[in-house]
Amino acid sequence: PSGNLIRFLNKLAERFPDKEFSTLAYLYSMQPPKHTKPHPNVNIMLCDIDCKREVPLTDNESGQWFVKALEGWSAISDNIFVWDYGINFDNIVSPFPNFHILQKNIQLFKKNNVTMHFSQVNGIRGGDFSEMRAYMIGKLMWNPDADADSLMHTFMNGYYGDAAPYLYQYQKIMQGALLASGQPLWIYDSPISHKKGMLNPHLMKVYDELFDKAEKAVENDKTLLERVQLSRLPLQYSQLEIARTEAGSDKQKSR
């Protein structure tokens, strides 16, 4: 299907050579055409919306389908824009531990002639570590080979102060639990999908204890305390969502 689209855009590009035209390589048009090359002033906006996010795009089946498309477009164009997704759109205030994949994905884009990159990772105040995600992605766009873990430490120390060590532990424990669970991380996920994995009862208790320590560490600094409490919202939201699904089973047990 992308062949017809690109041929149409090429006609426009020929008629208006001083203009640049951008088109989506999205869902049905994601894969590149076999017999047509986009003109230099035709920009390809390639979207990875269907990919799972628990590992880099190169490391799972849904991501590899996107990588195939990216490599195909890269072979015929130097004018590629990637629209990347990095938050949960159905449950935006919920944990989304994808920090460990950011660098490899950005390096992949750079390797394949991507000259523009939009990372849709923030939407509202109170999203899962949204400030840190924006900071890390911004830094990695400037330098894809920067030390990602060092960037996380730098941000946390500056933004959370003495609470930083506990929130770093929180991130790393949840990341490890996600990978160990084998459960995909999807942009239309529900916390309920992870209640036997990274959000199981034992880990939820661990997370709460870490946030309690984080709040205690900055209790005398109103600004830092509010930042920690705001970052706790995704955990609290998950607790409420999971509890909602289990309320009926508790009633059954009591009968």
Where are these regions (language model features)?
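Catalytic domains of carbohydrate-active enzymes that cleave complex glycans
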Residues: L140-R255
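Catalytic-core regions of glycoside hydrolase
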Residues: P1-D149, K205-D208, D212, K216-D221, ...
